[in-house]
Amino acid sequence: DGYITVLLSTDKAAYQPGEPVQLSLNNLPEGQVTIRYKHLNKVLSETPLTGKSWSWNPSTDDFKGYMVDLYTVENGEEVVLSSIAIDVSSDPARFPRNGFLSEYGKMSEKEINKVMDNLNRHHINYVQYQDWHYKHHKPLAGSPSAPMDVWKDIINRDCYRSTVQGYIDAGHKRGMKSLFYNLAYGALSDAADDGVKEAWYLFKDKKHGNKDYHPLGSPFKSNIYLTNPALQEWRDYMAQQNNDVYEVFDFDGYQIDQLGGRGELYDYNGNSVDLAATFPVFIKAMKEAQPKKSLVMNAVGQYGQENLIANSPVDFLYTEVWEKPTDNGFSVLSNIITNNDRWSNGKKTVLAAYMNYKLGGEGRGYFNTPGVLMANAAIHAWGGAHLELGEHMLTTEYFPNSSLAMKGELKKAMVTYYDFITGYENLLRDGGEFYGVTASSTDGKMTVNQWPPVRNQIATIGKRFDRRDVIHFLNYTNAVHLDWCDSNGTQVEPSLIESVQTKVSVKGTVRTVWAASPDARFGVSQELDFVQEGNEIKVALPSLKYWTMLVVEYE
């Protein structure tokens, strides 16, 4: 069921510098337990655990990740009982961790808090409100002076204003930004009644006879017809619609969606339209209309990302991943993240990468834990984040689809994985240069290769900083395929490899070596003994299940 015996929680998903952190525990463990606060592998302080709630004041440094853990000593050995990460960042765009919402029926405050507490425990700092709006061309139901209390969404579900605003308020209490979702260019069949002009649409022919549209059959209330973001009239119209939204709802920004490449398109006058080229103009217009609000735009399969969205005023880059090759799928993920880094001059990447996709489209079932964790290990090790958590975990592009459930083991693992990417954000997502690692196992327990992954081997990813190297080991020992999506849910759990004698090339005199893994010790780091011989060190990796991070610190 995913119940965690000793669960640590914090009152927020992220903190402003100088803000105190409130920590709490569901159960008080027996015996002498110590609370330990760390930044990376450096212990900042330790205090005895005396109760189920307390507060901590981190340093006022901005953009820092911390790990807090509870440990006890048994027979001279340290045993970690629980941990939680803390992100101190004045702006979530520095380390975005996206979640979503997809249902807005009548909900009590208690029900809303249950969903948001779960996102909060995963340190989600941006929440995108999928399918919340009334109509694509008129997102607000009613008017700013008389907003509707209940409206029908695109599939005729009831949406409650009290639920949408309740979620926004709950997010703000937890340090999360709320982004409302909408297409850049969508209009429903009744748009003329709401002031959308015929000349604003995109057409499949030069004589404005056939509008381009996204077909949606019953129970959806309308197809979605495409408008032309190149037109200032449409941009002004949408900016006004969004102003109406902001007057009623305390949203923090707009998550802009698109539908990928649409083939040949023409405007009303028969001129050819390069759809991707319209995105920067649209984003810029939305930013000018509301300079204080955050913007993000989905690049479907990277459509419109390079030189266009990537250079626009968006908080971070967001890619919906559709390429899923069976034999080198994981390099699709790393290529997207490294391209985005380069194209945007270092903005972070969030991937909408839907797991166990075929399984999710077939009906009720469970996510395949190894598939999900292998995808997350790869995305996180390359410095990305994975949009996957909401009221349920995502399996398809229709966000309300909750056909697949998470097993208890996956629920538990997700908590630690999110602690890991938050606690070690300064290594995973904060500078450094990727490099090719030279590493091998001297005891024959593993075969090591540089990224990309090879079945039955361990893949390494290196990141070099001024005075440290970070080396990720990702385990593909039993992989039956290398498709990140694990579409049919057939991926096999890797073998646990313990105390592996490892040889790694280094660039200078080594001061300390430490390791951390989301699969062991609740992600808490441990220092390791090592021997240096010239430009090599020998070190025993304590364990490798899915992903272990080795950190080499230099003098």
Walk through the language-model features, giving the residues of each.
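Active-site-adjacent "subsite" loops/lids of carbohydrate-active enzymes
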Residues: 90-96, 102-109, 180-249
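Aromatic/acidic polysaccharide-binding cleft in carbohydrate-active enzymes
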Residues: 347-432, 477
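C-terminal beta-strand-rich structural cap/linker in extracellular carbohydrate-active enzymes
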Residues: 533-555
